[in-house]
Amino acid sequence: MGLISHPVKLKNLVEQYNIKNFVESGTGSGDSMKVIVESGLFDNFHGIELDEEMYDDLVDRFPDVVNFYNGYSKDEMPNVLNNIDDSPTLFWLDAHFPGSDYQGLAYDSEKDDEKRIPLQVELKIISENRDISKDII
């Protein structure tokens, strides 16, 4: 997942499209989420993290601020979508299996393509469950 380190660059985009919700898959250590929360640009924050230990750390790091979901994004994205309104949303999507980033595993250690490279499934779930015409992905 690419790190968001310059929320000022997002400001014009967020204001132009009246973005209210921020959804991140593959939240990892939460560094990007921290930048987003502190930016004050969004009203609602949602993050999906596969690794249970990292998920627990995220919940402790952002109590009562971010709604976190623990599991594969293909399983948790429907839950996220059920918990956001139809306001314009910025989806910051992960595009790979996190094993090599955090667990020292090879990218090909996960044989299920939908888990190893979740981006296509995430896009499908989002587009089938909401009007994406006002969202940014």
Descriptions of predicted regions:
Residues 1-90, 96-137:
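A short alpha-helical cap/connector motif
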